[in-house]
Amino acid sequence: VFRYDSLGQDFKGNISLPLKVSAAHRFIALNKNTYLFFCEARKGNKMVVYDIDQKKIISEMYNLPRFLFFKTFYHHTYSPFYIYENKVHFVQSYNGDVFTFENNSLVPKYHWDFGKQNFDISGLKDESYEYYNKYARTVGAKYANTFISYVENSRYYIARFAYDNKFWTLMYDKQSKKHVVFN
């Protein structure tokens, strides 16, 4: 992994990943020496916490099947990470659940209950991309899923997701503890 300044102009150095981490698709710095890598193609745990000075994996988590990332729409389009109030946050793309990353583990922060429209991946099987292209427009369209963008500030958490073959917006008011969904 090549590191550059925030403008992407000045090369700062590189990070050599261990063989157990063949590719890092997304990453975020936890501090000067520690990175959280999201590795979609990796077997088993997709998140790896790596200490670049010690050149070792500190922890790993988030075991999901690889086909979700390569044959379905139920994965991240952009980074699954964002920073708010100096904490790294992770958004689970298939159902929109939000976690903070603390003490090398994921801690639940927001869970969205859409009732009968909650999306559950436990019944999904390793099928072709074509199968999931049709599935997303038929069976999958009956559920709130594919959370593609998200932002948080001191007052609101806002996310865009798919439901009923349309994109919808979820707006959660953190002060009133109420939410609204619209398209």
Regions found by a protein language model. Give the residues of each.
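Intrinsically disordered, low-complexity segments enriched in Gly and acidic/Ser/Thr residues
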Residues: E152-N183
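Short coil/turn segments that connect the beta-strands within blades of beta-propeller domains
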Residues: K32-T34, E85-K87, N153-R155
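Repeated scaffold domains used in trafficking and secretory/extracellular systems
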Residues: K20-L30, F69-P80, I121, A144-S149
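Conserved blade-ending motifs and adjacent loop-strand segments that build the rim/top face
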Residues: F69, K109-N145, S149, Q175-N183
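Beta-strand initiation motifs
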Residues: Q9-G13, K55-I58, S105-P108, K177-V181
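Asp-box/WD-like beta-propeller blade repeats and closely related beta-sheet repeat scaffolds
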Residues: V1-K46, I58-F70
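Loop-centered beta-sheet repeat module
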Residues: V48-L106
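Structural motif
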Residues: V1-R3, R42-V49, N95-F101, Y163-M171
